[in-house]
Amino acid sequence: EIMNIETILSPHLEKCPQINELDEKKRKQLASIIGFVDETVGIEHLVKCLAEGTSMGGDGVIRCYVGFEPSGKAHIGWKVLALQLRRMIDAGTNVMIFLADWHAWINDKFNGNMEHIQTTARYMEDTFRALLGHPDEGDGAGQLRFVWASTIMDSGDYWARVLRCSKGATLAMVRKTFTIMGR
């Protein structure tokens, strides 16, 4: 076995001693999910979900995501990421790849040409499918799915939420977000 479970989990034990309470199968699943990544956000929650067989969706399916602004050709970094995503799929998580087409447009990728941005997003879908070995697609355990920002933003629910959040936001709150927005 390529992965040494204890080597992967030991850096997280101080922050999350509950890892030691997981049975061997769940420890192996956790090690596959987190792999050798530098940062694992919410490991305590993940361990709790594994221990209890629960999830945020209420169906026991652990979901993770990675997001991209469609902006160019595939490079070796995509393969490195795909190796980890494949381990996550094999460990029974649902992997969502978020294609941030509107974010790319805001940041003037392809000079703000949405048609080029969305062509690149479709290229990314095809590339990741191939890099991941064409896994089953859907919202279930061990499946892959792609979600586009434009699809979410076309939803009436999205705009209702934007308006509710905007109504409660102050100028000071908005200013705090500038550093993470990139503009």
Residue ranges of each PLM-predicted region?
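NTP-dependent nucleotidyl-transfer catalytic core
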Residues: 1-183
